[in-house]
């Protein structure tokens, strides 16, 4: 599993909140749902995203924005339009006075707004994210990522708009997967921009030697890797691999592997009921004692304390 695949297993959409918003000016929605990640696509008209800090961003048809939470932000027809609705946790929407608006502004299946024929249409998907594997990638993103339509092409956006209002068996799973793919496409396009400040390990994926070594480590962390075995797989000497890996990734191969294993272990400890012994073996440690020692050394707490939320 590479880091982009890890993103799918980190903030992966599992019953994510997905909504088509149809609005006619003036309109403004203050978002205070605490979601760690929100993806917005404009399919008609325009919308402004006004973050808590930083400049407002105008979204036009075909544009996509990814907002990293949990800080509040506003989506509106214009930056200066006062909020008329408040979006809280779980997609609950109220007036500023606390009056529920979910039913009064409901326009159909997963469709909400102030006018059925409004000029602005925005697809909104919010994620729950508990995984550290995905967070390793998301932490490299800006608070507000904006991809204009003329800088990338993704055929998934029209498909998502078509599917969002359907109410058929398995539809939630379909929408979750499409949302996942749209997010991955956006992140990949963002990091591929000229001059993009992608994480070092992401840039290193393009190197024929280090990229192969990274994929080997990520795809099979339980293997008893050594610098020598990695070097043999990549066709270079141990010294050459260690030097090249450290220069491109920013840390030696075994240090990177330790961080990757512990991130995987942290997710398994929080997301499953597997024993510490089982988790240890899944991520490449000989047993619970070895994992506990590494966890304590690197993170300052035991696996049990991490699982308990310490």
Where does each model-flagged region fall?
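Basic/polar phosphate-binding segments, predominantly the helix-turn-helix DNA-binding elements
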Residues: 181, 185-191, 212-263, 278-309
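Glycine-rich phosphate/pyrophosphate-binding loop
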Residues: 117
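Short helix-to-turn junction characteristic of helix-turn-helix DNA-binding domains
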Residues: 42, 217-220, 268-269
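An amphipathic alpha-helical interaction segment
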Residues: 120-218, 240
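Generic structural signal for alpha-helix termini and adjacent loop/cap motifs
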Residues: 45, 78, 163-166, 192, ...
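Generic protein-terminus/edge-of-domain signal
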Residues: 1-65, 71-114
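Hydrophobic residues on short alpha-helical segments
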Residues: 39, 161, 214, 263-266
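Conserved hydrophobic/aromatic beta-strand scaffold that supports enzyme active sites
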Residues: 20, 41, 64-66, 122-126, ...
């Amino acid at each position: 599993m590479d880091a982009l695949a890890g993103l799918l297993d980190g903030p992966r959409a599992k019953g994510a909140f997905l909504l088509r918003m149809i609005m006619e000016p003036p309109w403004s929605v203050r978002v205070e749902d605490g979601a760690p990640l929100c993806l917005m696509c404009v399919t008609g008209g325009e919308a402004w995203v006004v973050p808590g800090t930083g400049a407002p961003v105008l979204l036009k048809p075909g544009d996509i924005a990814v907002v990293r939470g949990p800080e509040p932000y506003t989506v509106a027809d214009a930056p200066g339009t006062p909020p008329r609705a408040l979006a809280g946790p779980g997609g609950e929407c109220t007036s500023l006075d606390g009056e529920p608006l979910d039913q009064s502004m409901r326009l159909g299946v997963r469709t909400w707004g102030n006018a059925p024929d409004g000029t602005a249409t925005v697809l909104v998907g919010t994620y729950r994210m508990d995984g550290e594997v995905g967070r390793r990638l998301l932490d490299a993103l800006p608070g507000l990522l904006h991809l204009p339509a003329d800088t990338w092409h993704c055929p998934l956006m029209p498909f998502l708009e078509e599917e969002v209002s359907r109410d058929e068996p398995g539809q939630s799973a379909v929408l979750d997967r499409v949302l996942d793919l749209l997010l991955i496409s956006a992140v990949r396009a963002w990091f591929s921009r000229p001059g993009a400040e992608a994480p070092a390990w992401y840039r290193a994926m393009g190197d024929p030697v280090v990229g192969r070594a990274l994929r080997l480590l990520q795809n099979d962390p339980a293997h008893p890797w050594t610098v020598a075995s990695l070097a043999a797989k990549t066709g270079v000497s141990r010294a050459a691999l260690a030097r090249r890996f450290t220069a491109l990734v920013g840390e030696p191969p075994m240090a990177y592997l330790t961080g990757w294993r512990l991130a995987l272990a942290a997710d398994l400890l929080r997301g499953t009921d597997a024993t510490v012994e089982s988790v240890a073996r899944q991520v490449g440690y000989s047993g619970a004692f070895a994992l506990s020692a590494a966890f304590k050394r690197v993170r300052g707490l035991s696996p049990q304390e991490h699982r308990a939320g310490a």
